[in-house]
Curated annotation (Swiss-Prot):
Subcellular location: Secreted
Cysteines engaged in disulfide bonds, as pairs: 12-65, 16-41, 25-46, 29-48
UniProt free text on domains: Has the structural arrangement of an alpha-helix connected to antiparallel beta-sheets by disulfide bonds (CS-alpha/beta).
Protein name: Toxin Co52
Secreted as UniProt keyword: yes
CDD domains cross-referenced by the UniProt entry: neurotoxins_LC_scorpion (cd23106)
C-alpha cells in the first residue's frame, strides 16, 4: 500500500479546490480500482492514503505537469 496524489487521464494531479476534508477526493480515492482507504485535498490535488501498489501516482515519469 502507498500514499500519493491521484492522477487524471492526462497523467496530471487530479485537481480539487476545497482544501482538507473533501468528499470528491475521498470518493475518488475509494473507487474499487483505486483501492485507497481515505482521500483529501492537499495542495489543490486529491491525495490518497492506502492506495494499491498498481495505482499510478503523481508525478509520473516523463510528464511535465
Amino acid at each position: 500500500k502507498e500514499d500519493g496524489y491521484l492522477v487524471d487521464k492526462t497523467g496530471c494531479k487530479k485537481s480539487c479546490y476545497k482544501l482538507g476534508e473533501n468528499d470528491y477526493c475521498n470518493r475518488e480515492c475509494k473507487w474499487k480500482h483505486v483501492g485507497g482507504s481515505y482521500g483529501y485535498c492537499y495542495g489543490f490535488g486529491c491525495y490518497c492514503e492506502g492506495l494499491s501498489d498498481s495505482t499510478p501516482t503523481w508525478p509520473l515519469p516523463n510528464k511535465t505537469c
